[in-house]
Amino acid sequence: MSSTKQWDISKALAVATLFHFFHNVGKFCLMPFLTLYFRQLGLGASLVGIIIGFKHAVHLLWAPLCSFLAKSHRKRRFFIMASLLLSAGAGGLFAFYPPLDKNIVSLFCNTSMPWKEQLNPPIDISVFVDENISTTYATPTNHQTTNGEFNTFPSSVAEVAIDTTMASSLDMKTTTHQRFTDQFPSSSPLTRNKRLEHQTRKVLGSGKAQKANSSKSSASNSKQRSSLNNQTAPFATHPNVSHRPSIHERKVRDISIDFTDSFLDPKHKIFLIVLAMVIIWEILAAPLEWIADDSLYEYLDFVDATDRHGKLWIWGYLGASMGSIFITFLIDNLNCFVIFDIPRVSFHFFCYGGFLISTFFLSTLYPVHVSKKTEHSNKTVKALGFLGSDGRIVLTALTVFVLGAVGSTIQNFLFWQMQDIGSNELYMGLSIAAGLLSELALYFFRNKLLKTLTFKWMVVLGLLSLGIQFLYYSFLWTPWSVVAIQILNAFSSGVIWWAINSQVVDVASPGTERSLQLTLRWLAYGCGSSAGSFASGFIISRFSLAVLYQACCITLLTWIVIFLLVQPKLPNIKKINYSRLLAADNSDMSDSDEEQDRDWLVTAMKDENSNRKW
């Protein structure tokens, strides 16, 4: 930036406020509901957990690297604008590919209807019958013999499949909820196993009966088969007629087909496509927030107004609340399919792209400044090195890791739990807004809390509140019950991070507080969320959502006990280097004992005390 340019702080803050507001509106139109879209693609919890885990891992590595590479004003502006534009396009691509199955979309859409309309829903057998079976074996096959007569061969596979699916569909005719959980059994693996065992016995029984019937008719059909073989024998040696493969060839072919089908079945193909698309999307979107925050902070630091940087998150929370309510209200007032048979879930991506395009135009005016000092590029490295140098920071880092790991289960699968009990998306949006606004309301009492409670008890209060939330989630009974418990989010999220930020200010060396705070958030929402996403998906697949949330509650209670035992034993004395208070360049600061001994002001004070003779 030119030195002759006028520095308008009010205008810069106004643009930054609108930037963060619109970006969070667009972000919360889609991101909290992304796993619902993956579920409609037919992906299970374990596959969704892998996708989200890789998404967090890419952000963990790519965002700080891009921030390090963007060392000039032009590069930072380019990263911000390109990230907004390309991520909007990459997100909008999901609205068209991979395509959604209309039967699955209708099934999910039906769960959000009013309760009176769910009592006797129409049964569509095509939802439950496999497509290949219905098209290939649904009707008996007629074959004409050499005598001109028709023999009807029973399609036993189709009869068994239709019988079992009709039985299951009749069982599910009473309520839509039962029908929904049978098609997408994320929370009832025992029921699914029993039903599978019952259907297996039925298939085996029908197979034995079929075998007995076929043995009776084999004698009558043997003459027809022999005459048919005699008539077709002259054609067997024709070069254009393929011969029947040998037993060895059939075995090799069957093995290769089984391997290909098991590895590249439709579900895994969709999984690999979605995983690749999400990774590319995250590569495009990850640099935005980190670089934008660094640019604004260094801009305000240059004009000595960094105190105004800490309040921009309020506008981000307001935008997130408005975005979540807006998109869910819109979705619930749309039909299952709108013009051109576009499913209504696609409007999450359309609104995301639209608001990011609006933010793109604001980015042309976004305040960007790159400090000429070298200490800004070294602060992140110092913060990483500081994580292992102080026991209090190590304990805090482990706490935020646990917090990020268990918190990812709420972000990824809470709406699955709500969907299983028949919730529409409006309740989901209200739950997001309730949590954010409750944290925003408690913020005005933050200083009073910091004065009343110590760091230890604020962390315990936050972890205990989060544990209560998890226990509550495991026993959800109605959709609206989630909105009430989200009030505790003010303590489980807000109070913990306020306590951590205050601890960082007390422990970190001057000038590195913000870098250490960013590092801890990077550890929580990068490492912790990635590990939590990977683990939670497999836990849901093996057990259920309720078991997952109960396990998270037990984990938090266990960590509270560990925290209370370890925290009092850590040293609580901070070494103060007085000469750094007068230093003009923060890059020369050091917290080592050797530097403490060489402090000229401390040495002078010691000499003065030793020379006194009273």
Swiss-Prot record:
Pfam families: MFS_1_like (PF12832). It is found in: Membrane. The chain crosses the membrane at residues 41-61, 78-98, 270-290, 312-332, 345-365, 393-413, 425-445, 457-477, 480-500, 520-540, 546-566. InterPro entries: MFS_assoc_dom (IPR024989), MFS_MFSD6 (IPR051717), MFS_trans_sf (IPR036259). Keywords: Membrane, Transmembrane, Transmembrane helix. CDD domains: MFS_MFSD6L (cd17479). SUPFAM superfamilies: MFS general substrate transporter. Belongs to the major facilitator superfamily. MFSD6 family. PANTHER family: MAJOR FACILITATOR SUPERFAMILY DOMAIN-CONTAINING PROTEIN 6-LIKE. This is Major facilitator superfamily domain-containing protein 6-like protein B. The lineage of its organism: Eukaryota, Metazoa, Chordata, Craniata, Vertebrata.
